[in-house]
C-alpha cells in the first residue's frame, strides 16, 4: 500500500487569501470572522481528503526574517496588515489547534522556509508531500515527490503543471522570480522583464540565471519581443537580479524542534471548539458538534424507555403587533420619530410599482420587535382598520423628513408605491420618501456582486440563519394565489412585521461587514444609495411610445420573417418548423451535414444561438438565415408586439424597471421593457428607438459618454501614448490605425479605422488573435501581428493587463476606480477554459465597472441639478453609458450645455471625459 502523503498547509497564505478573496463576515458584536471561517473550511476539506496523512499547518511568526537583513526594502511596499485581519489571527490559531492540527511558527524565517525544510526532508525519506498553498513561490519545491494543491480553487500542480503555468521547470522558478521580481514581496527583479520575457530567456539559454549571464550574446537572437534591448538591461541590473535570486530562494535547512513523526493529527478538543464557535458565532458548526456529541451519548447509553431528544434551541422571542387602533398607532409613531434609524416595508396588491395598490405598511426600530399597519384588507370578515388617508397623512412628515434615517429592502419599490399612493384620491398627493440611509439588497450586492440572490428570504438564510415566512406560505400558488388585501390579518400581520424586523436585523449584520472595508462602504453610501431616489423618479416618469408606429413595424417584421422562412425552406429543400430544435437539428446535421460544435446535456446536437452564430460566421447559409429570423422574431415579440401592451393606462407611458443588484460589474439592467437589449447596429433595432418619442413642444436629448471604457483603460494603464491621444483630442481609433498600419494620420482609410476600432475594443474584452482576425477579415497570423504592434505602441496597456491578471489571481478579485469589488471564483481554476474566461473578466471588469460607477454618479449630479433648477426637463431613460432626457424645446440649448458639464464632472480621470449630445423628436434621431 502506498504511503499517505505528508500534508503541509501554508496557513499565512490562506489567511491572506481568505481575508481578501472571500466576502467578509462579522459577529453581531462586529468581530471579523470571515478569514477564520475560510481557512477552517479549507482545513476541514483537506482532513477529509487526506484522512490518514500527517499534517502541519504553518504560519509566519511575528517579527523580521533573515530576508529583511539581506534587503531592507523586502516587503516594504506592503501596507500594514489590516486590523480586521490581525484580530483574526489568534482565534484562527486557537481553532486550528482545537481541531487537532499541529501548528508551527518559527521566528526569523517565513512559513515558506519551514514548509520547504519539512517537504525536502520528507521527500528525502521517499514519502510523498502535498503542499497546500496559493503562493507561486512554492513551485520551486515541486519534484517527483512534492505536489502543490490549492484547496481554495481545487487545482493541483506537479512538474508538468509548473511548466504549463510558468513556462519553465520547477528548478528554474527561482531564476524566473529573480528576473521578473515579485511585487507582492517587493523583490525587485530586472525592471521591464515580465513573466513571458523571463520564461523566454530561461528557455532560450536552457538554464538559469548563471547560464543566462554567461550567454548574454545570444539573447538578441531569441524569439522574444524587444530581445535586442535586453542584454543592456540585464547587465545594468545584474546585481539586483542575483539579490532577487537569494530573496526568492526558499530555505530547506531550517533547524526545527519537531520531526516528521511529531506531525500527526489528534482528536479535536470539542469543549474548546464549542467555546470558540460561540465566540465566533459559527452556529452551524456549533450545532454540528452538539449533534455529534448527542449521537455518541445515545450510542453509549444503556437502553431506556425515557430517553428524550434534546429540544432545539429556542429562537429569540419576537413581538409583532398588528395596529388596529389609534392609541397603538400614536405610540408607534412616537417610537418611530424618536428612533435614530428604523426599517420600513410596504405590502401591496402586486409587484408592478406603477400600478399596484398600497395595502399596508410595517416598521421596526429594534430587532425582534415590529408592527404592521393594515390599511385596505378587504376579505369577508376583515376587521375594521384605521382610515387609510388619515394614517398616510400622519406618516407623511416622518417619511418625507430626510433627517429621519430609514432602511429598506429594495427600497425603490416602496418609494414608488408611496409616491403613487394618491392620498384623498389626488395622484399628486403622494409621499416622497426621503432619508433612505441603507438598503439591505444593495448592502449585500456591494459586499459580493457575484452572488446570485439578494432577496430578503435568501439573505435572511445566509446572514441570519433564519427561515422567513414566504409569500406563498400565506397566499398560496398559481391561479388561486391571493392578493395581499385578501389575506387574513392573523397571517398577514406577522408576515408583514417580519419583513421589517428581518430588514433591520439584516442591516445590522451587513453594515458591520461593509464598515470593515471602507472602499465598499463608500461605494454604497456615495454611489448606490444616492441613486435609489433618482431611479425611482425615472421609473415614475416613464417614456412616451408611438403605439401606432410599433404596429406598423410589427407587420413589417412579420413580413420579413415570412420571407426568411421561405429562404430557409429553399436552402433546406423542405419545409420544417424553425422553432423546433429537433427538426432544426435533423436538417442542419443529418441532411446538410454541418459540423456538430456542441451537444446538449442529453447528447443531442445543439441548435442554441451561440452555435448557430458560430456556424453563420463560418459562412453556412442556413444558420445565417436562421440568425436573421431569430433576430426579427425577438424584436417582434419583445418590442413591437409587447411595448404597446406595456403602456400604463393611467399615464399613457411605458415605465421600465431598473435593477441595481443584478449585473456583477455594477451596471444597471432593466426589464419590462429591457432597454439594454434593443440592438443599435441593425436598421430594425434603430427603428424601434424611433418609437420612443417626445410629446408635443418637447425634444428628446441623448447624452452619451464617448469611448468611455477606452478612456478608463488609458487612466488605469497610465499608458502615455493612449493618454496623449485623448488629451490631444485625437480620434483614438484613427491614431491606433496609423500605428498598426504604419501610415500618416491623414492617410488612414475608413476600413483601417474600423479594424483599429475592433482591436481597441477587442483587447479590452480579452479578444485573441483568432477572433480578431475573423472580425476584421484577416488571417490569425496577421491579426497577431496587429496585436503585437498595438502593444508595442501602447506598452502600458500590456503591462496593465499582466498586472491585473496577477493581482486577480493573488487576491481573488479586481476593483473599479471607485473601489467596487468583483470576485472571480474561477481565476485560479485548474480548468484552462474557466481560468481564461476569469482572466478576461479580470481585465474588462474594472473598466466596465468604473464606467457603470461613473454613469451612476452622473445620474445623481444631473438629478440634483434638475431638481434645484426647476427646469422643465426630466431624465426618462438610462441605457449603458447614455442618458435620455425629455426637454422643453426652448430649454434644449441650456440643458445640453449643463448635461455635458455635469456628466463630465462625474469622475476626475487622467484623461478628459467627453460627452456627445444629440437632439431629436425621437430617440433614434437624438443620436
Predicted features along the sequence, with ranges:
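Noncatalytic, basic helical substrate-engagement surface that gates or grips nucleic-acid strands
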Residues: 2-132, 136-158, 240-243, 249-257, ...
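Short alpha-helix plus adjacent loop in nuclease-associated cores
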Residues: 22, 73-88, 139-168, 230-232, ...
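Accessory alpha-helical DNA-binding modules that contact the DNA backbone or grooves
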Residues: 147, 152, 169-172, 179-246, ...
Amino acid at each position: 500500500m502506498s504511503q499517505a502523503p505528508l500534508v503541509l498547509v501554508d496557513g499565512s497564505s490562506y489567511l491572506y487569501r481568505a481575508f481578501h478573496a472571500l466576502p467578509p463576515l462579522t459577529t453581531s458584536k462586529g468581530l471579523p470572522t470571515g478569514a477564520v471561517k475560510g481557512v477552517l473550511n479549507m482545513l476541514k476539506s483537506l482532513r477529509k481528503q487526506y484522512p490518514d496523512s500527517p499534517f502541519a499547518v504553518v504560519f509566519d511568526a511575528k517579527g523580521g526574517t533573515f530576508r529583511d537583513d539581506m534587503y531592507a526594502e523586502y516587503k516594504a511596499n506592503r501596507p500594514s496588515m489590516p486590523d480586521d485581519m490581525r484580530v483574526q489571527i489568534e482565534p484562527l490559531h486557537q481553532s486550528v489547534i482545537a481541531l487537532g492540527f499541529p501548528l508551527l511558527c518559527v521566528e526569523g524565517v517565513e512559513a515558506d522556509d519551514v514548509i520547504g525544510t519539512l517537504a525536502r526532508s520528507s521527500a528525502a525519506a521517499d514519502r510523498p508531500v502535498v503542499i497546500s498553498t496559493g503562493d507561486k513561490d512554492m513551485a520551486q519545491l515541486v519534484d517527483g515527490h512534492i505536489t502543490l494543491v490549492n484547496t481554495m480553487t481545487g487545482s493541483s500542480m506537479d512538474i508538468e503543471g509548473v511548466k504549463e503555468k510558468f513556462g519553465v521547470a520547477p528548478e528554474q522558478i527561482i531564476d524566473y522570480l529573480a528576473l521578473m521580481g515579485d511585487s507582492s514581496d517587493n523583490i525587485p527583479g530586472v525592471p521591464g522583464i515580465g513573466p513571458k520575457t523571463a520564461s523566454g530567456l530561461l528557455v532560450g539559454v536552457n538554464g538559469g540565471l548563471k547560464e543566462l549571464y554567461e550567454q548574454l550574446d545570444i539573447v538578441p537572437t531569441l524569439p522574444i519581443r524587444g530581445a535586442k534591448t535586453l542584454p543592456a538591461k540585464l547587465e545594468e541590473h545584474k546585481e539586483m537580479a542575483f539579490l532577487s535570486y537569494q530573496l526568492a530562494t526558499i530555505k530547506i535547512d531550517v533547524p526545527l524542534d519537531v520531526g516528521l513523526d511529531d506531525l500527526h493529527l489528534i482528536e479535536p478538543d470539542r469543549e474548546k471548539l464549542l467555546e470558540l464557535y460561540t465566540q465566533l458565532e459559527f452556529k452551524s458548526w456549533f450545532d454540528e458538534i452538539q449533534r455529534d456529541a448527542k449521537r455518541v451519548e445515545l450510542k453509549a447509553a444503556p437502553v431506556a424507555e425515557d430517553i428524550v431528544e434534546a429540544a432545539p434551541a429556542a429562537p429569540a422571542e419576537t413581538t409583532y403587533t398588528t395596529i388596529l387602533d389609534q392609541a397603538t398607532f400614536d405610540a408607534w409613531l412616537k417610537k418611530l420619530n424618536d428612533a435614530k434609524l428604523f426599517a420600513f416595508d410596504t405590502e401591496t396588491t402586486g409587484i408592478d410599482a406603477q400600478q399596484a395598490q398600497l395595502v399596508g405598511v410595517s416598521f421596526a426600530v429594534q430587532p425582534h420587535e415590529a408592527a404592521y399597519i393594515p390599511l385596505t384588507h378587504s376579505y369577508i370578515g376583515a376587521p375594521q382598520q384605521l382610515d387609510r388617508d388619515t394614517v398616510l397623512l400622519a406618516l407623511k412628515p416622518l417619511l418625507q423628513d430626510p433627517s429621519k434615517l430609514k432602511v429598506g429592502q429594495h427600497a425603490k419599490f416602496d418609494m414608488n408605491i408611496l409616491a403613487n399612493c394618491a392620498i384623498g384620491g389626488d395622484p399628486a398627493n403622494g409621499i416622497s420618501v426621503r432619508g433612505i440611509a441603507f438598503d439591505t439588497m444593495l448592502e449585500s450586492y456591494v459586499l459580493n456582486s457575484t452572488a446570485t440572490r439578494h432577496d430578503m428570504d435568501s439573505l435572511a438564510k445566509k446572514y441570519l440563519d433564519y427561515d422567513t415566512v414566504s409569500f406563498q406560505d400565506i397566499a398560496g400558488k398559481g391561479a388561486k394565489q391571493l392578493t395581499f388585501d385578501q389575506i387574513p390579518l392573523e397571517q398577514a400581520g406577522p408576515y408583514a412585521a417580519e419583513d421589517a424586523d428581518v430588514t433591520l436585523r439584516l442591516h445590522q449584520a451587513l453594515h458591520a461587514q461593509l464598515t470593515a472595508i471602507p472602499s465598499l462602504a463608500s461605494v454604497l453610501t456615495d454611489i448606490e444609495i444616492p441613486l435609489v431616489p433618482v431611479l425611482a423618479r425615472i421609473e415614475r416618469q416613464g417614456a412616451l411610445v408611438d403605439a401606432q408606429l410599433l404596429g406598423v413595424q410589427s407587420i413589417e417584421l412579420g413580413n420579413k420573417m415570412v420571407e426568411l422562412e421561405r429562404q430557409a425552406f429553399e436552402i433546406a429543400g423542405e419545409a420544417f418548423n424553425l422553432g423546433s430544435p429537433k427538426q432544426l437539428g435533423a436538417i442542419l446535421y443529418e441532411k446538410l451535414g454541418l459540423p456538430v460544435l456542441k451537444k446538449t446535456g442529453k447528447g443531442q446536437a445543439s441548435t442554441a444561438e451561440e452555435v448557430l452564430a458560430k456556424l453563420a460566421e463560418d459562412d453556412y447559409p442556413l444558420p445565417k438565415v436562421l440568425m436573421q429570423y431569430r433576430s426579427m422574431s425577438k424584436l417582434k415579440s419583445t418590442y413591437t408586439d409587447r411595448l404597446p401592451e406595456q403602456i400604463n393606462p393611467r399615464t399613457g407611458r411605458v415605465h421600465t424597471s431598473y435593477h441595481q443588484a443584478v449585473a456583477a460589474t455594477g451596471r444597471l439592467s432593466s426589464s419590462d421593457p429591457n432597454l439594454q437589449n434593443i440592438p443599435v447596429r441593425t436598421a430594425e433595432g434603430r427603428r424601434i428607438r424611433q418609437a420612443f418619442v417626445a410629446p408635443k413642444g418637447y425634444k428628446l436629448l441623448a447624452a452619451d459618454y464617448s469611448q468611455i471604457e477606452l478612456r478608463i483603460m488609458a487612466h488605469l494603464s497610465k499608458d502615455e501614448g493612449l493618454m496623449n491621444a485623448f488629451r490631444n483630442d485625437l480620434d483614438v481609433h484613427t491614431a491606433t490605425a496609423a500605428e498598426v498600419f504604419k501610415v500618416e494620420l491623414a492617410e488612414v482609410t475608413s476600413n483601417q479605422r474600423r479594424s483599429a476600432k475592433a482591436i481597441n475594443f477587442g483587447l479590452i474584452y480579452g479578444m485573441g488573435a483568432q477572433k480578431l482576425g475573423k472580425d476584421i477579415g484577416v488571417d490569425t497570423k496577421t491579426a497577431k501581428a496587429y496585436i503585437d504592434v498595438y502593444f508595442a505602441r501602447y506598452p502600458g496597456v500590456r503591462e496593465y493587463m499582466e498586472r491585473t491578471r496577477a493581482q486577480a489571481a493573488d487576491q481573488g478579485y479586481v476593483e473599479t476606480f471607485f473601489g467596487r469589488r468583483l470576485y472571480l471564483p474561477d481565476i485560479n481554476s485548474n480548468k484552462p477554459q474557466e481560468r481564461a474566461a476569469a482572466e478576461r473578466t479580470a481585465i474588462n471588469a474594472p473598466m466596465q465597472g468604473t464606467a457603470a460607477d461613473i454613469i451612476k454618479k452622473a445620474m445623481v449630479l444631473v438629478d440634483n441639478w434638475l431638481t434645484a433648477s426647476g427646469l422643465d426637463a426630466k431624465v426618462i431613460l438610462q441605457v449603458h453609458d447614455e442618458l435620455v432626457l425629455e426637454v422643453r424645446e426652448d430649454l434644449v440649448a441650456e440643458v445640453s450645455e449643463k448635461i455635458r458639464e455635469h456628466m463630465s464632472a462625474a469622475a476626475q480621470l487622467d484623461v478628459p471625459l467627453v460627452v456627445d449630445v444629440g437632439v431629436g423628436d425621437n430617440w433614434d434621431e437624438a443620436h
